[in-house]
Amino acid sequence: MDDQSRMLQTLAGVNLAGHSVQGGMALPPPPHGHEGADGDGRKQDIGDILHQIMTITDQSLDEAQAKKHALNCHRMKPALFSVLCEIKEKTGLSIRGAQEEDPPDPQLMRLDNMLLAEGVSGPEKGGGSAAAAAAAAASGGSSDNSIEHSDYRAKLTQIRQIYHTELEKYEQACNEFTTHVMNLLREQSRTRPISPKEIERMVGIIHRKFSSIQMQLKQSTCEAVMILRSRFLDARRKRRNFSKQATEILNEYFYSHLSNPYPSEEAKEELAKKCSITVSQVSNWFGNKRIRYKKNIGKFQEEANLYAAKTAVTAAHAVAAAVQNNQTNSPTTPNSGSSGSFNLPNSGDMFMNMQSLNGDSYQGSQVGANVQSQVDTLRHVINQTGGYSDGLGANSLYSPHNLNANGGWQDATTPSSVTSPTEGPGSVHSDTSN
């Protein structure tokens, strides 16, 4: 221990016994008779050593290099190194059982997979652009969707550029700091025992510290991509963007089948082709429409009347055209006094079938004035051409009374035929079906 004390005193530049170092060698200690007087001197020397340690940071680079060179050239330096190795061997037992490698962070792996799937990280192979193209194709591929697709790709490219720029800055800072620490540890390994394995462990610790910054960068990038997808590729937003023509077609089918507004698969496919949408979108639209109609029957009755008026006008024009065609082609025009009959066209048959629904008749007060005038016009045309009585008078086309007590839809009964109340020789016979 005396050798170790003398070695430390020599390296510090001051002898613990109160004597300065001369020529790199410490002077012999004083006789044992002066131990009482040397107590204060030792305290003062320890204070001087601490002062020198505290002033190391104030030294210039040349002074530090000179002291480092003197330490490396000192003859007691190997002995100091061996002592430090023994101390480390005793105190280093507690850290040997520590885990060498930590498992990969699952959250970081999820972020990496998401960025790779969206085309942000890794080589650009489509990623989110392919998703945008699929969404545009599913929604019909209109010009508006093409514009949104191009906007989505532009913003996704911008997010990708920002991500890679910040990732390069992160990697550069991490590499610079890691290189600095490794050089520092290699330099210190000349004075104190530091193994290459310990340097690798320190590098791993540095990378784990920096991984929190990397995780924050990837998390913010994933949030930006999710916001971008919700803005451009959200299915709910696409459902609200049906064209006016598609909405008209769907509403017309709904109100013309109000007794049973559940289209078959063939009808859904036909409506999807007409509206340039998918079959699933048609199913979703009818489901939402049924729910809204049952909740607000009074509100949607006015809309039903409008579509009923449109159907009535179409049927009236079809009947008038058929009658005019018969008058043109036949030598004698049938009237109410003649003995003869003629068949109505399909469109007229369909309209005549609207006389009653589920066996119930509806008053004309349920239909607006415009609808009533169209019904009167149609009845007048039929009476003039076929001797038809007022069996159709003042009947509403659509009615909200198709819901049962449980809020469900009643199945419409299909009338077998629609005939005149008085079957004279000039009556009209028409077999119809739903």
Curated annotation (Swiss-Prot):
Biological-process GO terms, alphabetical: adult locomotory behavior; dorsal spinal cord development; neuron development; positive regulation of transcription by RNA polymerase II; regulation of respiratory gaseous exchange by nervous system process; respiratory gaseous exchange by respiratory system
Residues covered by the PBC domain: 41-234
Location relative to the cell: Nucleus
Annotated segments matching region PBC-A: 48-127
PROSITE patterns: HOMEOBOX_1 (PS00027), HOMEOBOX_2 (PS50071), PBC (PS51978)
Coiled-coil stretches noted in the UniProt entry, renumbered to this chain: none
GO cellular component: nucleus; transcription regulator complex
Compositionally biased region (Basic and acidic residues): 32-41
Annotated Polar residues bias: 405-422
Region (Disordered): 20-41, 326-349, 405-434
Keywords from the UniProt entry: Activator, DNA-binding, Homeobox, Nucleus, Transcription, Transcription regulation
InterPro entries found in the cross-reference section: HD (IPR001356), Homeobox_CS (IPR017970), Homeodomain-like_sf (IPR009057), KN_HD (IPR008422), PBX_PBC_dom (IPR005542), TALE_homeobox (IPR050224)
SUPFAM superfamilies per UniProt: Homeodomain-like
Low complexity bias locations: 326-341
Matches recorded under Pfam families: Homeobox_KN, PBC
Start and end residues of each stretch annotated as PBC-B: 130-234
Residues within the DNA-binding region(s): 235-297
One Gene Ontology term of the molecular function aspect: RNA polymerase II cis-regulatory region sequence-specific DNA binding
PANTHER family: HOMEOBOX PROTEIN TRANSCRIPTION FACTORS
Family: Belongs to the TALE/PBX homeobox family.
Function: Transcriptional activator that binds the sequence 5'-ATCAATCAA-3'.
Quaternary assembly: Interacts with PBXIP1.
Name of the featured protein: Pre-B-cell leukemia transcription factor 3
Source organism: Mus musculus
